[in-house]
């Protein structure tokens, strides 16, 4: 029997994935979004955590749903590297270095593809177009470690509650992750994983403590309060989990919790609106293709912009976007959501057709 999905959690995922694409699109409020949007996904995963079926079953599931997409997507981008060079999606033109944050790409050989795929298998590096998958790597590492620690604690404590020892362990890892960030150490993404373990833990705590039945006016008040807190905190510090950067451990925890409240109340407040609820839930069930494909999808907007303005072809390789200001972020966001959804729909249709035969 299929597991019943929580529509509020799906909507929260949907809001989170929209925020992620917005944060990469040149949206003016990107710094605000970065305060909490990636922490949200770790907390959602913690909320859904269950060792039902045992640790081996859990690990196998994470290998299929996280590790395999990471390896396959990065390998696909590597295989397509030379084609992307011909199409200017990537470029070897050194003029691209004049665009901040960009790098020159060189052609790859079959040997390169094999060698890099081995690296992807152990989360050593990644591709430019697959840059957002740092999160998939970190979530895999955190999920597996949390499950193993939980299993060991259950054995040691003979079935007693593991919440307190897990909390103490997550606190130690948070401190270590913060120190790693200050030192610039992040081998295999382990610094990020150490920092984010506590966010996964927070999700498990919230699952136990969250009240479901709250009057609408109280939800509105909580939403407004969380928004105000984040606005204030945004003036006091910053969060950049992709680089394991945050002002302090306490700052990370407070912004993450405020972001959770903001997004959860938004999901609950929009639940009575069928169109919004269905759209957010649909997005929430398609987070992986959006994470993998939204940077590539941005290229369509840049290409159309260059056709209109007569820009140099090599500028198509500008990453993640080239055009900024005005309403360009709207176009990039639309492409970053719609095109991956379309690709996912085609993939599912082909998959179902093949399975049917």
Question: Where is each model-derived feature located?
Answer:
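Alpha-helical transmembrane segments and their immediate juxtamembrane cytosolic regions
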Residues: 1-357
């Amino acid at each position: 029997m299929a597991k019943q999905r929580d529509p509020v959690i799906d909507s929260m995922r949907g809001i989170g994935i929209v925020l992620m694409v917005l944060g990469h699109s040149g949206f003016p409020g990107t710094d605000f979004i970065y305060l909490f949007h990636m922490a949200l996904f770790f907390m959602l995963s913690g909320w859904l955590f269950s060792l039902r079926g045992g640790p081996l079953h859990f690990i196998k599931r994470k290998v299929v749903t996280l590790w395999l997409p990471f390896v396959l997507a990065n390998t696909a981008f590597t295989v397509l590297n030379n084609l992307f060079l011909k199409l200017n999606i990537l470029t070897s033109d050194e003029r691209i270095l004049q665009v901040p944050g960009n790098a020159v790409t060189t052609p790859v050989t079959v040997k390169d593809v094999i060698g890099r795929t081995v690296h992807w298998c152990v989360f050593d590096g990644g591709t430019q177009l697959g840059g957002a998958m740092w999160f998939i790597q970190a979530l895999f590492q955190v999920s597996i470690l949390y499950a193993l620690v939980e299993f060991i604690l259950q054995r040691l404590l003979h079935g007693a509650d593991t919440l307190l020892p897990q909390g103490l362990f997550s606190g130690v890892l948070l401190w270590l992750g913060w120190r790693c960030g200050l030192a610039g150490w992040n081998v295999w993404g382990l610094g990020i994983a150490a920092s984010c373990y506590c966010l996964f833990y927070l999700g498990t705590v919230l699952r136990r403590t969250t009240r479901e039945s709250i009057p609408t006016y109280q939800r509105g008040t909580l939403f407004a309060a969380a928004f105000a807190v984040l606005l204030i905190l945004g003036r006091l510090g910053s969060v950049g989990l992709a680089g394991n950067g945050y002002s302090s451990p306490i700052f990370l925890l407070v912004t993450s919790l405020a972001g959770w409240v903001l997004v959860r109340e938004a999901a609950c407040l929009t639940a009575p609106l069928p169109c919004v609820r269905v759209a957010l839930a649909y997005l929430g069930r398609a987070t992986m293709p959006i994470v993998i494909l939204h940077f590539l999808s941005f290229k369509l907007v840049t290409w159309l912009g260059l056709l209109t303005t007569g820009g140099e072809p090599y500028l198509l390789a500008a990453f993640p976007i080239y055009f900024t200001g005005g309403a360009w972020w709207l176009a990039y966001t639309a492409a970053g959501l719609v095109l991956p959804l379309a690709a996912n729909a085609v993939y599912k249709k082909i998959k179902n057709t093949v399975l049917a035969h």
